[in-house]
Amino acid sequence: REFHGSEKKLEKQQELLMRLQENGINTDYFLRNNQESLVSKDKTEQRFTLQHWYEGKECDTKSREDILKSVRTLARLHILMKMEPVEEYREEYLRHNQELRKIRKFIRNKGASNVFEKNYLASVEQFLERAQYAVKLLDETDYDDLRERAWREGQVCHGEYNQHNVLMLKGDHLGTAVTNFGHWSFDIQVADLYRFMRKILEKYNWNLELAGEMLREYHKIRPISAEEWKNLRVRFTYPEKYWKLANYYYSHKKVWISEKNVEKLQNLIRQREIWENFAEECFRDYPQ
């Protein structure tokens, strides 16, 4: 595939992939060329990379077996993914909250002229209230200690761990492969678990039973600390998907809004009460 990034970061990624591969996690590691480089060039000087690939199918979000197998794979992945630093995300939440207010002001000043804008104005106060509550929860947790520990241990996240990047290997009943590590970063590792669970649970209308199964499967392999448990609650409390839709609208010149994004916003509004209840119920009791 074409490559446009930093070769230095790519070497770090390869180091990570090979460590995982050597410890029994199938990855799409890079293949070196005759010059022992990970990046090659064609006649037009276009840079590209070659990666090991697998015969298999993506994680089926309709299959609980695939979902739970993916969670177990993520737990094993996190045990092995250690390198070095993390970024503060409290400031990110505060910035996102300010952006939600800015978009609200922009639409009010110009007048809501389409379905997306009308839905946004009708719902933004409730989602903003939830966003501010998430910041308050974060301030009440041991987030600084959690960040310091993640920094000290060099915890690494996949960055885009979702159903498209977990393959169920053909002919291997137990095997999985994890692909597309291009967004790896230093972070608190339950960020990966949050992202995977959120994408699945949106499809299951925030089903508490399924969420409990996913958390238990992960916890059995890589125990979730009490601080990480609180951090997961904060992440599920913050309306990240709502902010993403609003930010996409605002940063793309507000000229045309796709039907798909209107549907996504309407679905978030419909699910709001179930989603709010989910964060309270799911993380009420720390697993024993």
Task: Specify the residue positions occupied by each region the protein language model found.
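Active-site activation/catalytic loop segments of kinase-like enzymes and analogous catalytic loops
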Residues: 190-223, 236-255
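ATP/Mg2+ or Mg2+-diphosphate-binding catalytic cores
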Residues: 242-288
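ATP-binding pocket architecture of kinase catalytic cores
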Residues: 1-86
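A glycine-centered beta->alpha junction motif in the catalytic cores
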Residues: 48-61, 102-113, 196, 238-257
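Helix N-cap / loop-to-helix initiation motif
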Residues: 26, 224-228
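Active-site acidic catalytic loop and adjacent metal/ATP-binding pocket
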Residues: 30, 136-190
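ATP-dependent phospho-/nucleotidyl transfer catalytic cores
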Residues: 7-8, 87-157, 213
